[in-house]
């Protein structure tokens, strides 16, 4: 049985999980966020978004000062009390955004793959794609260790593109709406394990972990959690885990923040 009184970390995806996929509303999750905050349970945001976007959202959600995982694990924003850790305030894994952009531009020029990156357009275009304000859309372009893109070619070409990236030490990852290119060594799972170990080192005891996500790129995160909530999502691929023991994995009937609330209700209130 889970209790918010025990040493606990909650890791959560954003779009389609804690935030509504279309309106970005999070109010259905607000009561649980308040309850966790009052119990001093860290809610660690974990997303494909940039750290600039996530810091803005973190403050909006009342979670400022906590660590977060940005760009699918390629960037870790450290907790404000971790100032003695090398790299503070952020740890960046592997190849930089600029280097990845150079690789993609070369592949597009020489092998004629068809895609559009966030670097190819302005904030007004991204605002149209996402429904964000222009000021928020501008934050989506502040990548440090990944590139976000829209794929505009065939499935066959995608397989070729993925293979070429793998040869170059990169990975091609599907998110809720867009595709992401990042260092092959980076991942939400590695970033989460690093944060868990840091909390364990501080307290002397490994905290119990609960993760929530809705897309294929959340699977690595949910695999390393003690308990997992798979929020009903829009992605046709869904989320599939190696261990879907119903005592540790709950699939919600509701989407977005209502599903987020349902998952917390299942593992806490209903047990």
From Swiss-Prot:
Keywords: Cytoplasm, Hydrolase, Magnesium, Metal-binding. Mg(2+) binds at residues 13, 15, 214. It catalyses: 2-O-(alpha-D-mannosyl)-3-phosphoglycerate + H2O = (2R)-2-O-(alpha-D-mannosyl)-glycerate + phosphate. Its cofactor is Mg(2+). The keyword Metal-binding applies. One of its GO terms (cellular component) is cytosol. GO terms for biological process: mannosylglycerate biosynthetic process. It is found in: Cytoplasm. Its EC number is 3.1.3.70. The active site is at residue 13. The keyword Transcription regulation does not apply. GO terms for molecular function: magnesium ion binding; mannosyl-3-phosphoglycerate phosphatase activity. Belongs to the HAD-like hydrolase superfamily. MPGP family. HAMAP family: MPGP_rel. This is Mannosyl-3-phosphoglycerate phosphatase.
């Amino acid at each position: 049985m889970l209790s918010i009184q025990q040493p606990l970390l909650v890791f959560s995806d954003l779009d389609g999980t804690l935030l509504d996929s279309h309106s970005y509303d999070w109010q259905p999750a607000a009561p649980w966020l308040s309850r966790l905050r009052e119990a001093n349970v860290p809610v660690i945001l974990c997303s494909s978004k940039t750290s600039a976007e996530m810091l803005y959202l973190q403050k909006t959600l009342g979670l400022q000062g906590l660590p977060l995982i940005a760009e699918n694990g390629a960037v870790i924003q450290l907790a404000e009390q971790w100032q003695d850790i090398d790299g503070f305030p952020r740890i960046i894994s592997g190849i930089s955004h600029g280097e990845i952009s150079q690789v993609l531009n070369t592949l597009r020029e020489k092998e004629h793959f068809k895609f559009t990156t966030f670097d190819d357009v302005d904030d007004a275009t991204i605002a149209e794609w996402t429904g964000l304000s222009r000021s928020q859309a501008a934050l989506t372009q502040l990548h440090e260790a990944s590139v976000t893109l829209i794929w505009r070619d065939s499935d066959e070409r995608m397989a070729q593109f993925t293979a070429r990236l793998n040869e170059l030490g990169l990975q091609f990852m599907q998110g809720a709406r867009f595709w992401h290119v990042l260092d092959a060594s980076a991942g939400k799972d590695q970033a989460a394990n690093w944060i868990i170990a840091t909390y364990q080192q501080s307290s002397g005891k490994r905290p119990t972990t609960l993760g929530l996500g809705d897309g294929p790129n959340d699977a690595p995160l949910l695999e390393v959690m003690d308990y997992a909530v798979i929020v009903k999502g829009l992605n046709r691929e869904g989320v599939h885990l190696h261990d879907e023991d119903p005592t540790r994995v709950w699939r919600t009937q509701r989407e977005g923040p209502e599903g987020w609330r349902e998952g917390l209700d299942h593992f806490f209130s209903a047990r």
